[in-house]
Amino acid sequence: VKEVYLDEDLISEIRDMRPKLIGIDAPLTLPRGRRGVEDKEGPKFRLCDLELRERGIKFFPVTLGPMRSLTLRGIMLKEKLEKLNYRVVEVYPGATQDILGIPRKSRGLSLLREGLRRLGVRGVREGLSGDELDAITAAITVQLYLEGKAEFIGDPTEGLILIPKG
């Protein structure tokens, strides 16, 4: 795990790794019919969001204050990576943690670290931030997909989220 802040640095790291699939922990699409993140009148949820809710998984909608900038950055990063011929998917570590039965970072970083270790993840050391632990969880989601143990929820024409099969 390595923290990077600028898109250019992230893309450089990705080029070095040459992944088969990239999971981004941010909304990568807007609800169908929504004109932008600042649109006050458009739909608030995507089908994939509603499917999370049906499964009892809590999330922040793309229209919520701080999620707006995260959504914009996610969409722009996805576009940059796809132009470089990478396959990019949306992941939600909170959903993966809930489905796999490990605590979210809101319950405490030590509990999340221990949960990741129980899953067999090596290198989960003290001092990793909540964002880094979520990045590890995102990578687990992608690995599960590559092993046939994860699925997409939502509508392909609106947006999909990759989650472990329950």
What are the language-model segments listed below?
Residues 1-166:
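Phosphate- and other anionic-substrate recognition elements at nucleic-acid/protein interfaces
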